[in-house]
Structure formats: C-alpha cells, structure tokens
Amino acid sequence: RGRLGYNLLEKELLKRDFEIYVPLLENTKIDCIICKNGTLLKLQIKTIQTSRGHKNLPVRKISHNQGEYKIHNYTSAEIDFFIGADVETDDLYIIPVSIIEQYKSAISITTLEFYKNNFALLEPQVGNNLSGCDDVGETLTGNTEGIE
C-alpha cells in the first residue's frame, strides 16, 4: 500500500512539472525530494490507515530490529512536508511539517480538509529559493566539495 501512495503522489507531481529525486537507500527519513524553479522540498509519504471506521494519518515511524522497537517523530530539521496518501479515494494531503510536529502518533483526516489535494502549498514561493535543482546532492549530504 505504501508504494501505491508513492505512485499516486509521483503522478500528481509530474503533472505539475516537479522534478522528483529518491534516495538510494530505503530506510531514510526522506522519501523523496522535489524540485521546481530552483526550490527543493523534502517529503515524507505515509498511507492513510482505517481503524474502527475512522481514517487516520500516522505521523511517526515505528521500526523494530531483533525485538527492539524504535519510535521516531519527524521534525522540520528533517522534512518540509508530510504527504498523506488515501489509496482508497486517490486523495493526497499536503501537510507542512509544522502541523505534524503538534501530534504524537496520528491525525484524523477529518481535521485535514484544508490540506486535501492542496498542491499549491508545494509551489515555489518568493524568497523560498535555494541555489537550484542541480544541488540536490549537496542538500542531502551537506557536502559542498563534491565526492572525494
């Protein structure tokens, strides 16, 4: 289901002329970086889940290794937007990470109506311009010197 959500987002971003970059490793805090007009945005994508008839967006990562569970809450230092993908309705919730940081585990999608398919939030804004899409590697690694 996670891949379906990513594919849905990818289709919508490409229709809107975004460039999409994905990490080589799967276990990263960033699912993809998008670029348009020189503006880079880091995205985390989660599939909307239904529990007891209610749809919720999980806002943390739970991983386990050899019986040890780790819970990670995403921050604005790591990502710019959280994308909730409802694969039953093909709706995408475009949520700034500042909203996500206010919740511990999940958000009911009934409170997220403003963010439903609101792709305008991802469009480059005046004053929100980095040095360009060619600098994706530098943004990911912090390395301004290139590969050594």
Where is each model-derived feature located?
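Short alpha-helical elements
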Residues: L9, R16, T39-L43, F81, ...
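Non-catalytic C-terminal interaction segments of nucleic acid-processing enzymes
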Residues: T89, Y93-T144
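Conserved catalytic cores of phosphodiester-cleaving nucleases, focusing on short active-site segments
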Residues: L9, L13, C32-I34, T39-Q49, ...
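Acidic-basic catalytic patches of nuclease active cores, encompassing PD-(D/E)XK
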Residues: R1-P23
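Conserved functional hotspots at enzyme active or ligand-binding sites that engage polyanionic ligands
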Residues: L14, F18, L41, V59-N73, ...
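Catalytic cores of nucleic-acid endonucleases
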Residues: K46-L92
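Beta-rich nucleic-acid/ligand-interaction surfaces
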Residues: N27-D31
